[in-house]
Amino acid sequence: MRVLFCSSEIYPYAKTGGLADFSFCLIKYLKKYGVKVKGVMPYYKTLKAENLRKTDKGVTLNLNGKDYTFEVYESEDCYFLRNDELFGRDYIYGPPGWGYEDNDIRFGGFSRAVSELISTGQLEADVVHANDWQTALIPLFLKEVFKTPVKTVFTIHNLAYQGLFPKETVERVGIPPYLFHMEAVEFWGLVNFMKGGIVFSDLITTVSPTYAKEIQTQEYGYGLEGVLKKYSYKLRGILNGIDYEVWNPEKDKYIYQNYSLRNYSKKFKNKEFLSKELGIEAEKPLISFINRFTHQKGVELILNCAEEMSKLNANFVFLGTGEYENAFLDVSKIYKNFKVFAEFNEGFARKLYASSDFILMPSYFEPCGLTQMIGMRYGCVPIVRKTGGLRDTVKDISEGGYGITFEEPSKETFLCSLKRAIELYENAKKFRNSVKIVMSLDFSCDRMTKEYIECYEEVQSHQ
């Protein structure tokens, strides 16, 4: 089976978020299971790659009345489509806070170029796997423009970002005009790239079973709940995984003291070192938030509860960047048990995972979430809101589980969950048992990869 994995970002070549990690992980593990897989992504100015080989493959497209030539480079595991006018820029999607105005041409053009390269046999595939709005038009182009027999799988990582563009985009990127209607890519007078992937792919996946259900509701569907209900027969929820070779406290070179499930008590040495470094009391529970400071991650809930949290017998560490980072920095100046680091620092993040007693994720919505999985891999007991993948990965201790969960995103329920966590910590035997359980859970890429292989086999069996 030959799989072409299409993504706007693949680690280590380009990364702005979890899509890059997912792409890297799935490609790596598909190879492990004998699948002939290769990634394909844009050749960005910021691309982190060496020794790429320029191939004799390529395609020229007319986009918005102008010709663009895409040259094809390759590494061992990935193709890169190069057009410096479109992708030779300082940012992948645009400066912080906004996207480039021609992102429809950039990613619509990329999707059409990939599709034409497949249709002409320059890129080989039995199954094409597209991801999120940036590559969502590939199933449409393959089926409606190039009429290829290649099967397609489309993964929704976050429905909140759909790739919405004006009606003129139809002509600008070469979408057949007859597809601009509500049963295809039209969405309230706009072109919706994500909708194109949903309608024209052979199978849709999303990143957790609960999120697959949630996106069919008005609360989480962002206007696409109707079309997702219509195509629910081809929708699957597959829980994301993390690479246990990359995230491994037994071999992590960044942390103070390596440890594993067999000698997990060494984890607490990490906490002692970090507490000394940060000037906090090691005997108090350490609750950490390692994520973006954005609305989705429930940060308003934290900020609204800051005064009450300052009175709890616990220390809180926040690591991340985003629109609320100044608000967090301001709070940290008021309350001594709040430590805030407004940066993306992988080395420090790993130290924090290894040192923390609890990992905090009060997200308003969470398609899957990797932070809680990494935290549990490192022995952090999760405190999460029951939504999306958080619901699928964390079982409350009151129900025979190992974590702390809450349902309503209110001050009362959130503070109650923090108090329950502190009570758990103060019961040393019960707390250490939870640590042992979370470290023994399997959220590896192995499980996820097997499910995707089943999806590929399913679409190949379709006539």
UniProtKB/Swiss-Prot annotation:
It comes from the Bacteria. One of its GO terms (molecular function) is alpha-1,4-glucan glucosyltransferase (UDP-glucose donor) activity. Its EC number is 2.4.1.21. ADP-alpha-D-glucose binds at residue 15. Belongs to the glycosyltransferase 1 family. Bacterial/plant glycogen synthase subfamily. Synthesizes alpha-1,4-glucan chains using ADP-glucose. This is Glycogen synthase. The gene is glgA.
